[in-house]
Amino acid sequence: MSDNNEKQTLRTVEGRVVSNKMDKTVTVLVERQVKHALYGKYIKRSTKLHAHDADNACNEGDVVRVTEIAPMSKTKNWRVVEIVTRSAE
């Protein structure tokens, strides 16, 4: 087992806010490209994450950077670190 002194790196991903209807929570769509095992074609895959937005600062369409945290609820274990770009609205 590893030492407790080693700092564990937290995963950080970028995605687009698709919903901000919940209080202090946003839904972030994270897209990635995966290579098909047999044919080699790159395919888009996406994941929706619930992230904590303490200030309710995010709007739909914003590109945000989120990082992993300890679970805050059943589905929410990400936190908005920064808003990379604002939506045009």
UniProtKB/Swiss-Prot annotation:
Pfam family, one: Ribosomal_S17
UniProt superkingdom: Bacteria
Keywords in alphabetical order: Ribonucleoprotein, Ribosomal protein, RNA-binding, rRNA-binding
GO biological process, one term: translation
Annotated PANTHER family: 40S RIBOSOMAL PROTEIN S11 FAMILY MEMBER (PTHR10744), SMALL RIBOSOMAL SUBUNIT PROTEIN US17M (PTHR10744:SF1)
Function as written in the Swiss-Prot or TrEMBL entry: One of the primary rRNA binding proteins, it binds specifically to the 5'-end of 16S ribosomal RNA.
Protein family: Belongs to the universal ribosomal protein uS17 family.
A GO cellular component annotation in the UniProt record: cytosolic small ribosomal subunit
A GO term, aspect molecular function: rRNA binding
Listed name of the protein: Small ribosomal subunit protein uS17
CDD domains for this protein: Ribosomal_uS17 (cd00364)
Self-association and partners: Part of the 30S ribosomal subunit.
SUPFAM superfamilies registered for this protein in UniProt: Nucleic acid-binding proteins
